[in-house]
Amino acid sequence: MNRVLYPGTFDPITKGHGDLVERASRLFDHVIIAVAASPKKNPLFPLEQRVELAREVTKHLPNVEVIGFSSLLAHFAKEQGANVFLRGLRAVSDFEYEFQLANMNRQLAPDVESLFLTPSERYSFISSTLVREIAALGGDISKFVHPVVADALTERFKKQA
Protein backbone atom coordinates (compact mmCIF):
# COMPACT_ATOMS: atom_id res chain seq x y z
CA MET A 1 0.00 0.00 0.00
CA ASN A 2 1.38 3.40 -0.99
CA ARG A 3 0.98 5.89 1.84
CA VAL A 4 1.98 9.48 1.18
CA LEU A 5 2.57 12.01 3.93
CA TYR A 6 1.90 15.66 3.07
CA PRO A 7 3.44 17.69 5.91
CA GLY A 8 2.97 21.37 6.59
CA THR A 9 1.79 23.96 9.07
CA PHE A 10 -1.41 24.61 7.09
CA ASP A 11 -2.01 27.95 8.83
CA PRO A 12 -4.50 27.95 7.19
CA ILE A 13 -5.04 25.26 4.59
CA THR A 14 -5.55 26.92 1.18
CA LYS A 15 -7.08 25.90 -2.13
CA GLY A 16 -3.51 25.32 -3.31
CA HIS A 17 -3.00 22.74 -0.56
CA GLY A 18 -6.38 21.23 -1.38
CA ASP A 19 -5.42 20.93 -5.04
CA LEU A 20 -2.31 18.92 -4.15
CA VAL A 21 -4.27 16.69 -1.76
CA GLU A 22 -6.94 15.98 -4.40
CA ARG A 23 -4.31 15.04 -6.94
CA ALA A 24 -2.36 12.93 -4.43
CA SER A 25 -5.58 11.11 -3.50
CA ARG A 26 -5.79 9.89 -7.09
CA LEU A 27 -2.15 8.77 -7.14
CA PHE A 28 -1.85 7.05 -3.75
CA ASP A 29 -3.85 4.53 -1.78
CA HIS A 30 -3.75 6.66 1.37
CA VAL A 31 -2.90 10.33 1.92
CA ILE A 32 -1.98 11.65 5.35
CA ILE A 33 -2.09 15.41 5.81
CA ALA A 34 0.44 15.84 8.60
CA VAL A 35 -0.30 19.13 10.35
CA ALA A 36 2.82 20.25 12.20
CA ALA A 37 2.52 21.95 15.58
CA SER A 38 5.28 24.40 14.47
CA PRO A 39 5.39 26.48 17.68
CA LYS A 40 8.43 28.44 16.42
CA LYS A 41 6.28 29.76 13.54
CA ASN A 42 3.78 31.17 16.07
CA PRO A 43 0.73 29.95 14.11
CA LEU A 44 -2.42 32.04 13.95
CA PHE A 45 -4.60 28.98 14.64
CA PRO A 46 -3.90 26.36 17.31
CA LEU A 47 -2.94 22.89 16.09
CA GLU A 48 -6.35 21.37 16.87
CA GLN A 49 -8.15 24.00 14.79
CA ARG A 50 -5.76 23.63 11.85
CA VAL A 51 -6.35 19.87 11.93
CA GLU A 52 -10.13 20.37 12.05
CA LEU A 53 -10.08 22.87 9.16
CA ALA A 54 -8.01 20.47 7.03
CA ARG A 55 -10.45 17.65 7.85
CA GLU A 56 -13.41 19.79 6.84
CA VAL A 57 -11.78 20.83 3.55
CA THR A 58 -10.89 17.23 2.62
CA LYS A 59 -13.86 15.32 4.06
CA HIS A 60 -15.06 14.40 0.55
CA LEU A 61 -11.90 12.36 -0.05
CA PRO A 62 -12.28 8.91 1.56
CA ASN A 63 -8.59 7.99 1.39
CA VAL A 64 -7.37 11.17 3.11
CA GLU A 65 -6.60 11.35 6.81
CA VAL A 66 -5.54 14.43 8.79
CA ILE A 67 -3.27 14.05 11.81
CA GLY A 68 -1.52 16.66 13.94
CA PHE A 69 2.05 15.97 15.04
CA SER A 70 4.86 17.59 16.99
CA SER A 71 7.67 15.07 16.55
CA LEU A 72 10.45 14.85 14.00
CA LEU A 73 8.87 14.38 10.57
CA ALA A 74 11.03 11.36 9.74
CA HIS A 75 9.91 9.61 12.93
CA PHE A 76 6.27 10.51 12.31
CA ALA A 77 6.48 9.12 8.77
CA LYS A 78 7.81 5.81 10.11
CA GLU A 79 5.06 5.69 12.76
CA GLN A 80 2.45 6.19 10.04
CA GLY A 81 3.98 3.67 7.64
CA ALA A 82 4.42 6.35 4.96
CA ASN A 83 6.72 5.61 2.05
CA VAL A 84 6.53 9.03 0.32
CA PHE A 85 6.77 12.65 1.44
CA LEU A 86 4.67 14.97 -0.74
CA ARG A 87 5.84 18.55 -1.09
CA GLY A 88 4.43 21.36 -3.18
CA LEU A 89 6.58 23.65 -5.31
CA ARG A 90 4.91 26.93 -6.24
CA ALA A 91 7.95 28.55 -7.80
CA VAL A 92 11.64 27.97 -8.47
CA SER A 93 12.32 29.87 -5.24
CA ASP A 94 10.71 27.01 -3.26
CA PHE A 95 13.02 24.42 -4.82
CA GLU A 96 16.26 25.24 -2.99
CA TYR A 97 14.70 24.90 0.47
CA GLU A 98 12.72 21.81 -0.53
CA PHE A 99 15.82 20.20 -2.06
CA GLN A 100 17.73 20.65 1.22
CA LEU A 101 14.78 19.31 3.19
CA ALA A 102 14.47 16.28 0.90
CA ASN A 103 18.16 15.47 1.32
CA MET A 104 17.93 15.77 5.11
CA ASN A 105 14.82 13.60 5.17
CA ARG A 106 16.63 11.02 3.03
CA GLN A 107 19.35 10.85 5.69
CA LEU A 108 16.81 10.50 8.51
CA ALA A 109 14.31 8.25 6.72
CA PRO A 110 16.06 6.54 3.79
CA ASP A 111 13.02 4.37 3.00
CA VAL A 112 10.79 7.40 2.40
CA GLU A 113 11.02 9.11 -1.00
CA SER A 114 10.27 12.80 -1.59
CA LEU A 115 7.86 13.68 -4.37
CA PHE A 116 7.38 17.24 -5.58
CA LEU A 117 4.17 18.40 -7.23
CA THR A 118 3.45 21.80 -8.65
CA PRO A 119 0.00 23.24 -8.02
CA SER A 120 -2.48 23.97 -10.77
CA GLU A 121 -1.55 27.34 -12.23
CA ARG A 122 -4.68 28.98 -10.82
CA TYR A 123 -3.29 28.27 -7.32
CA SER A 124 0.43 28.72 -7.94
CA PHE A 125 0.62 32.13 -6.27
CA ILE A 126 -1.37 31.30 -3.13
CA SER A 127 0.38 30.98 0.21
CA SER A 128 -0.99 30.76 3.74
CA THR A 129 1.04 33.85 4.65
CA LEU A 130 -0.54 35.94 1.89
CA VAL A 131 -4.01 34.67 2.78
CA ARG A 132 -3.51 35.66 6.44
CA GLU A 133 -2.27 39.11 5.45
CA ILE A 134 -5.21 39.73 3.11
CA ALA A 135 -7.70 38.50 5.72
CA ALA A 136 -6.12 40.65 8.45
CA LEU A 137 -6.62 43.72 6.27
CA GLY A 138 -10.24 42.86 5.50
CA GLY A 139 -9.68 41.65 1.92
CA ASP A 140 -11.72 39.05 0.08
CA ILE A 141 -10.06 35.64 0.45
CA SER A 142 -12.90 33.56 -0.99
CA LYS A 143 -10.90 32.68 -4.13
CA PHE A 144 -8.02 31.33 -2.08
CA VAL A 145 -9.58 29.24 0.70
CA HIS A 146 -12.56 26.96 1.36
CA PRO A 147 -15.57 28.82 2.89
CA VAL A 148 -15.07 27.19 6.30
CA VAL A 149 -11.49 28.50 6.36
CA ALA A 150 -12.61 31.99 5.29
CA ASP A 151 -15.14 31.97 8.15
CA ALA A 152 -12.47 30.90 10.65
CA LEU A 153 -10.14 33.68 9.49
CA THR A 154 -12.90 36.29 9.66
CA GLU A 155 -13.77 35.16 13.18
CA ARG A 156 -10.12 35.16 14.28
CA PHE A 157 -9.48 38.68 13.06
CA LYS A 158 -12.72 39.96 14.64
CA LYS A 159 -11.40 38.73 17.99
CA GLN A 160 -8.10 40.53 17.45
CA ALA A 161 -9.74 43.84 16.49
Curated annotation (Swiss-Prot):
UniProt EC number: 2.7.7.3
Pfam families per record: CTP_transf_like
Record protein name field: Phosphopantetheine adenylyltransferase
Record pathway: Cofactor biosynthesis; coenzyme A biosynthesis; CoA from (R)-pantothenate: step 4/5
GO biological process: coenzyme A biosynthetic process
GO terms, molecular function: ATP binding; pantetheine-phosphate adenylyltransferase activity
ATP-binding in keyword set: yes
Record gene name: coaD
PANTHER family: PHOSPHOPANTETHEINE ADENYLYLTRANSFERASE (PTHR21342:SF1)
Sequence similarity: Belongs to the bacterial CoaD family.
Catalytic class of the enzyme: transferase
Top-rank taxon: Bacteria
A GO CC term assigned to this protein in UniProt: cytoplasm
Cellular compartments annotated: Cytoplasm
